[in-house]
Amino acid sequence: MNARVIRVVVVSGSLRAPSRTHGLLQALVERLPAVLPKLEVHWVRIAELSASLAGSLERDSASADLQPHLQAIEQADLLLVGSPVYRASYTGLFKHLFDLVDHQSLKGVPVVLAATGGSERHALMIDHQLRPLFAFFQAHTLPYGLYASVESFDDQRLADPAQFERIERVLDTVGAFFHIPVARAA
């Protein structure tokens, strides 16, 4: 079987680099080949694009360095998106990035939602903020989200075994979406 290459776009909504949000998404990306053996990964890091985003009020006037990232999002086969929790929501520039995305381009695209925060009390941000944002785009948000608090990290790297188990559940849903059987150790 000659499977097609899956275009994966990872959006890290943190305003800092390095960040725990990037660490969580990186842990997911590192395990993704277990279910998607042929993939292309494109990273969109808000921390690196903040000046371009802040200066782009409309899609037509978006800066030249921002355009390839917007096009990658609009052409993605799979989105992995994450943001730190700021005042019970995602970062403003994360939202602004998606304000510039064509509102019809994500219809039916699977999206893995992820967030990081100071404590577990912010975990509902995934369902109360991120999921409705992608519902607007008519994207297919996968049922398991990833939320990790400060205790799950060693510096900026994910270190909590329970989080790696959650990533495995997320990967199962990704594999199911693309009709790829997931082989697990007994």
Swiss-Prot record:
It holds the Pfam family FMN_red. It is an enzyme of class 1 (oxidoreductase). Belongs to the SsuE family. Transmembrane segments: none annotated. It comes from the Bacteria. PANTHER family: FMN REDUCTASE (NADPH). Its EC number is 1.5.1.38. SUPFAM superfamilies: Flavoproteins (SSF52218). InterPro entries: Flavoprotein-like_sf, FMN_Rdtase-like_dom, FMN_Rdtase_MsuE-like, NAD(P)H-dep_FMN_reductase. Keywords: Flavoprotein, FMN, NADP, Oxidoreductase. Gene3D superfamilies: 3.40.50.360. It catalyses: FMNH2 + NADP(+) = FMN + NADPH + 2 H(+). One of its GO terms (molecular function) is oxidoreductase activity, acting on NAD(P)H, quinone or similar compound as acceptor. This is FMN reductase (NADPH).
